[in-house]
A protein has these predicted regions:
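Domain-core detector
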Residues: 1-55, 63-126
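Functional cores of ribonucleases/endoribonucleases
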Residues: 17-27, 32-34, 116-182
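C-terminal edge-of-domain segments
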Residues: 50-65, 160-174
């Protein structure tokens, strides 16, 4: 059995064993918390969902949803502009220096499309496996961190780094930053 097939079977089994929940904000009362509203209909692995209730007057609940629903509908999205010009920053407009890491691994701005596809693929895969960490939660939403691994283009081996995402309703995660650190 080849390694790729074995890994696919292993991931499928892992995914089917995950318990998923959908966050639901019940529209009762007059006032609503921005953080709670931003979580409405977002999906999380049960063990890695934000703690409910979030606050004393929280009306939110979590409802179990089938892993098959998550697997069928989950999607990872990223804007091309997160790679070109943001990540590689050819005009030094952003002044974040993230391009230096990728360039040291042999990547250039011409690799932006490949990086976008690969980071989306691995982001979705790791989200489905529950391999994410909760980050900041506020009225804009719940951020998660997902570790991805890419091959070095200028040598042997791989490099692993953290990517930053926002959890959106219905199983969508959207990339905030393609490089959040090692």
């Amino acid at each position: 059995m080849n390694q790729e097939f074995y890994n696919a079977v292993k991931e499928s089994v892992q995914m089917s064993q995950q318990r998923w929940v959908e966050w639901r904000h019940e529209m009762t009362g007059l006032l609503h918390c921005g953080s709670c509203l931003s979580l409405h209909k977002c999906w999380f692995v049960f063990e890695k969902a934000p703690v409910s209730p979030l606050h004393e007057k929280c009306h939110c609940t979590t409802v179990a949803i089938p892993a098959s629903q998550v697997k069928s509908n989950a999607v990872a999205k990223s804007d091309y502009s997160k790679y070109n010009p943001y990540l590689f920053d050819p005009t030094n407009f952003y002044k974040h220096g993230k391009n230096k890491a990728f360039e040291s691994w042999g990547y250039t701005i011409s690799d932006s499309e490949w990086l976008q596809n690969e980071i989306e693929k691995q982001g979705k895969q790791q989200y489905l496996l529950g391999n994410y960490e909760l980050g900041v939660l506020n009225m804009r939403g719940q951020r998660i961190s997902i570790r991805v691994t890419i091959p070095r283009k200028n040598g042997t081996g791989e490099v692993s780094f953290v990517t930053g995402w926002m959890v959106n309703p219905g199983g969508e995660i959207k990339l905030n930053t393609p490089y959040g650190g090692k």
